[in-house]
A protein has these predicted regions:
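Thiol/disulfide oxidoreductase modules built on the thioredoxin-like
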Residues: 118-120, 128-178
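Short acidic-hydrophobic, aromatic-tinged amphipathic segments that line or gate anion-handling sites
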Residues: 48-49, 123-127
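A short beta-strand-turn-helix
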Residues: 38-65
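N-terminal targeting signals for export/organelle localization
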Residues: 1-47, 183
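Active-site-proximal beta-strand/loop segments in catalytic clefts of secreted hydrolases
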Residues: 69-70, 100-103, 127-128, 165-167
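Short pre-active-site segment immediately N-terminal to redox-active cysteine/selenocysteine motifs
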Residues: 63-65, 69-73, 104, 148
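Hydrophobic beta-strand anchors of alpha/beta hydrolase catalytic cores
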Residues: 66-67, 97, 152
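Structural microenvironment flanking redox-active thiols in thiol-disulfide oxidoreductases
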Residues: 79-119, 131-139
Length: 183
């Protein structure tokens, strides 16, 4: 009997300790460095580098960068498009808004139709790296792998500023942009 208990414990205890490991794949990926190559509907390239929890967009140092993770079928995403366009125009030299669609296989023509219909006058990227990027951002912000949209995340010089879940008033976003810019 003692022998069976000892054998059982020698099998079960290592399995328990494996389950208690603090280095999950998600945590490891948060520390790792990655580069995401994004292309908008006009063919403009954006290279986003993730270093730890920070996200940098090459060539946009000093700007506030906001990733708008959205879908064309999402009513709150549609409603926010004109507000984001207004902010992009107002803070043009200090702000970069990148719309990141969660829709696989959507045609650029469909995204351009969305931009036209809902007044989205900011870059919308449609690349094979979209999903990798929005999952990395969701992981870094601890939003989980299933998060509501729109999901917007703001960075300044790669550093996380804030994020918004769901439709957010333009005034709230603008207030955070001003704070990030030191205004």
């Amino acid at each position: 009997m003692f022998k069976k208990t000892l054998i059982s414990l020698s099998i079960v205890l290592p399995l328990l300790f494996l389950g208690c490991s603090s280095d999950s794949d998600e945590e490891k990926s948060m520390v790792a460095s990655s580069t995401f190559h994004l292309v908008d509907t006009k063919g403009v390239d954006y290279n986003v580098t993730k270093e730890g929890l920070n996200f940098y967009v090459k060539g946009h140092d000093g700007k506030v960068v906001m990733f708008d993770i959205f879908a064309t079928w999402c009513p709150p995403c549609r409603a926010e498009a004109p507000n984001l366009s207004h902010l992009q125009k107002k803070y043009n030299d200090e702000l970069l808004i990148l719309g990141v669609t969660i829709e696989d296989g959507i045609a650029n023509a469909d995204l351009d139709a969305f931009k036209e219909k809902y007044g989205a006058e900011y870059a919308i990227v449609n690349s094979k790296d979209n999903e990798k990027l929005y999952r990395a951002i969701a992981s870094a912000t601890k939003a989980g792998q299933r998060f509501p949209i729109p999901f917007m995340v703001m960075y300044k010089d790669g550093q996380y500023i804030t994020h918004y879940v769901g439709q957010t008033p333009e005034e709230m976003i603008e207030s955070d942009i001003k704070k990030a810019l030191g205004k």
